[in-house]
Amino acid sequence: VGAASFEAIPLDQIERIEILRGPASSLYGADAIGGVIQIFTRRGGSSLAANASVGYGTYATATGAAGVSGTSGPVRYSLQAGGRRSDGFNAIANPANFSWNPDRDGYETANVTASASYDWAKDQSLGATYFRNRLDNQFDASAGHDDRTITVLDAWQVESRNRITPAWRWSIVAGRTADDSKSSTEYGEYDYRTRDTQYRWQHDIVLPAGDLSLAYERREERLTENAGFAVTSRDTDSAIAVYRLVSGPQALQVNVRHDDS
C-alpha cells in the first residue's frame, strides 16, 4: 500500500518532470516531507501535431512510438502509443552466485496514453486522462527457472476546473490507479494488486493581501496479495490550507494539513 511502479511509466509518454524541493507535505501528504517529483504526461497543444520515432540498439533492443495531438475549437486532445523490447543480458554473470542463470534477462513493454479536455465556457473546463502500460521483465532469482515479473499499470483521472468569481476558482479531481504485478520464480508465484483511488476538491482564492488555497482530499488504498501482509487497506481524509503572501523580495507561506487515516 502506498508504493508506485515508476518503472512502468514509459519515457516517450512523459512531457516533463518537475522537482519541488523542500517541505511539501501540506499539499502532497506526509511522504513529501523533503519534496516531490511530479511527472507530467503529454497533452494536446494549440495546433494539430503528429510524432513518431523508432530506434534499435545493442542486445536487440527495439523501440517505437507514435502519437497525435491538437486542438479543435474548445476541445484539446492527445493520443500516444509506444513499445519497447530487448533481449537483454545475463543479470547475474558470476556462476558462483546461487541465483546464477545462464539465460538473458530481457523485457517487453507496451503503452498507451489518451487525454482530452473541453472548455465549455470561458474559464470552465472538463478533462479526462487514461494511461495503460504492460511490462514483462525477466530477472535472475534461481538457477533453473525463467524468473519474470509482469506488471500492468492502469490509471484514469477526470477533472473539472471552474472560475466561480474573478477572485475564486475551484477544481474537482477524481482518479484511480490499478497496479497488478505477478512474479514467477522457482520458489513460487507472488501476486500484488493495488487500487489507489483519490478525490480532491480545491479552492483557490485571491485575497486583498495574498492568496489562500483550501482543499479536501480523500485517498482509498487497497491491496490484494498472497504474501500474507498484515495491513492491506488504508483510507485517509485530509484537510489542507495554504496561505501565500509576496511583497517585493519578501515571501511568506503558511501551510496547515490534517490527515486522518
Predicted regions and their residues:
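Short, glycine-/polar-rich solvent-exposed loops and beta-turns at beta-strand/coil boundaries
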Residues: 1, 29-33
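Short acidic, glycine/proline-rich loop/turn micro-motifs
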Residues: 1-2, 49-50, 90-95, 139-143, ...
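Short acidic/polar hinge/loop motifs at secondary-structure boundaries
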Residues: 1-21
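Extracytoplasmic
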Residues: 12-14, 32-36, 47-49, 63, ...
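Non-catalytic regulatory/gating segments with a bias toward low-complexity or hydrophobic composition
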Residues: 17-18, 37-39
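Short beta-turn/strand-loop junction motif enriched in small, turn-promoting residues
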Residues: 22-25, 258-260
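Periplasmic-side early beta-strands and strand-to-turn transitions of outer-membrane beta-barrels
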Residues: 25-26, 38, 45-47, 53-55, ...
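Face-selective signature of the C-terminal outer-membrane beta-barrel domain
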Residues: 117-135, 150-261
